[in-house]
Amino acid sequence: MDTLQKKNNLFIPFIVAVIGSALMLLTIFLPYTSATKEFAERIDSYPEAVAYSNTDIKVSDVKNVSMVQYASMYSSNSKEILHQSSVGTIYVVIVVGIGLFSLLSLIFALLKKPIPLIISDVLAFGVFTFLGWDFRDRGLMRSAYNWGIGYYLFYIGIVMALVGAVLLIVAKKKGKKQLQEN
């Protein structure tokens, strides 16, 4: 009975942490940026137009762009887009970092390991924040783009994962205290 009660006390924090961590991982595939309404209308008018000279990227490819798509575009076309061939590698590393730390968060949530979960969440958040800062610093967010659904869902996911981790810590401490009292 005590073991069943302990498992029940961990269930809700576990589910919250797993859903939050899975959401963080999912966001690297969802639109990180989305074209503004006006820019989207222009894209729809000329979907086959080339977005960047000397590339095969069409404007329809950059209407809603995920972190993975940015990394792919920048790694294969960084000289044409960013004017430096090595910069694309940096974006790949950043997106892989976000994905890796989000995956680690999911693994630690599934293993019910709240401290490593918190650490991986903080690392994922740090890399994600750096990517957002870079986009704002380069002026991308002031022009034809808004943040996409992936950007906002990442914040929801990280809050859920952190809340789940804290609740796991509390539930585990309560469970240990109850075992000591019995």
Predicted regions and their residues:
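Compact integral membrane and secretory-pathway proteins
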Residues: 2-182
